Amino acid sequence: MAVKIRLRRMGAKKAPFYRVVVADSRSPRDGRFVEEIGYYNPISEPKAIKIDEEKAIKWVKNGAQPTDVVKRLFKEAGIDEKLSK
């Protein structure tokens, strides 16, 4: 099973809110997921990013591939530095 860390869209029309989830790469964007590890709210000012570092590091070490947007969120949250160690 190829696992990805990606965003799951929630919220209302024209007011997106995203949950950072670990999901099978073949499942739909808003479909089944294995575990929720955080959230991202691009509408709030400043943008709200909350990611559970322990869960994120555990999943990446187990082979989960973060998408490009999630990599950027990891960098903004400071998790990227801990992954490179």
From Swiss-Prot:
UniProt cross-references to SUPFAM superfamilies, sorted A to Z:
Ribosomal protein S16
**One GO CC term, this protein:** small ribosomal subunit
Q: Per its UniProt record, what Pfam families does this chain match?
A: Ribosomal_S16
Q: Write down the InterPro entries for this protein, in alphabetical order.
A: Ribosomal_bS16, Ribosomal_bS16_dom_sf
Which GO BP terms sit in this record? translation
Q: Name one GO molecular function term.
A: structural constituent of ribosome
Entry keywords, A to Z: Ribonucleoprotein, Ribosomal protein
Q: Does the keyword Ribosomal protein apply?
A: yes
Q: List the disulfide bonds.
A: none
The Swiss-Prot or TrEMBL record describes its family as follows: Belongs to the bacterial ribosomal protein bS16 family.
Q: What is this protein called?
A: Small ribosomal subunit protein bS16
